[in-house]
Regions:
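Hydrophobic faces of well-ordered beta-strands that scaffold small-molecule active sites
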Residues: 10-16, 40-42, 70-72, 87-89, ...
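Glycine-rich phosphate-binding active-site loops on the catalytic face of alpha/beta enzymes
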Residues: 14, 89-101, 130-142, 167-199
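Alpha-helix-loop-beta-strand connector modules within alpha/beta enzyme cores
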Residues: 52-72, 91-94, 98-114, 144-169
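N-terminal amphipathic alpha-helix/helix-capping segment at the start of soluble metabolic enzymes
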Residues: 1-28, 153
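Acidic (Asp/Glu)-rich catalytic clusters
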Residues: 29-36, 64-65, 100-103, 122-125, ...
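Catalytic cores of alpha/beta
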Residues: 70-85, 113-126, 157-188
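Glycine-rich, proline-tolerant flexible connector loops at the mouths of alpha/beta enzymes
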Residues: 41-51, 133-140
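Glycine/Thr-rich beta-alpha phosphate-binding loop at enzyme active sites
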Residues: 82, 86, 109-156, 195-197
């Protein structure tokens, strides 16, 4: 049973994937917010921008009720229209955004998969990085994880916060291993979408 993850030195971000839920998605988001992660990244890659914007409004409202930061994914123009100044983007999108557009955000997170990408994202103004995938995960079946050595190398090469992603669980031993590598936190996808019992 999980009560809270917000009292950890190691920061936990929830990343959504509504296809993993066993109950209505918004109900699951509320359950996630009840354990107070550092933030919720609304990552629903199959939606159109219009569909995403409609869902984002509802998720932002739930996050606001629980005072949990909501980070919108990919559709940065929609984020601005909704008054959300925290976004998580693929590196190719960050490369196309102007400096003036970047200034409209208080937080820009970037997904990276190599040390070179990490350095590039930092140079372009990323506030934090997610580096992965670190552990084996069903989301990346057949792909070998990059592992803790990769995470440690990324953390050594940049001066911005790094979160591990990929196969991250509610496992303090795992969290400790990532923290020793220099990561500030980890992103949990499957575990967050399947929380069913709270203390």
């Amino acid at each position: 049973m999980i009560k809270s993850v917000n009292n950890q030195n190691f920061k936990i971000i929830a990343v959504s994937n509504r296809k993993l839920c066993n109950r209505p998605f918004l109900e699951q988001i509320e359950r996630v917010c009840k354990i107070h992660p550092e933030a919720v990244i609304l990552r629903e890659k199959d939606l159109t921008e219009e569909e995403y914007g409609t869902l984002a409004k509802e998720v932002m409202n739930i996050c606001s009720r629980y005072q949990v930061s909501c980070i919108l994914h990919n559709f940065w123009k929609t984020a601005l229209e909704l008054g959300c100044t925290s976004v998580h983007l693929p590196l190719p999108i960050l490369q196309k955004i102007t400096d003036e557009e970047k200034k409209k955000f208080t937080k820009i997170g970037i997904s990276i998969h190599s040390v070179e990408e990490a350095k590039e994202a930092e140079r372009l103004g990323a506030y934090y990085l997610t580096a992965g995938h670190i552990y084996a995960t069903d989301c990346k079946k057949g792909l070998l994880p990059r592992g803790l050595e990769f995470l440690e190398e990324v953390c050594k090469e940049v001066n911005i916060p790094v979160y591990g992603i990929g196969g991250i669980k509610f496992d303090e031993e795992q969290w400790n291993d990532m923290e020793k590598c220099g990561a500030i936190g980890g992103c949990i996808v499957s575990g967050m979408m399947k929380i069913y019992q709270l203390k």
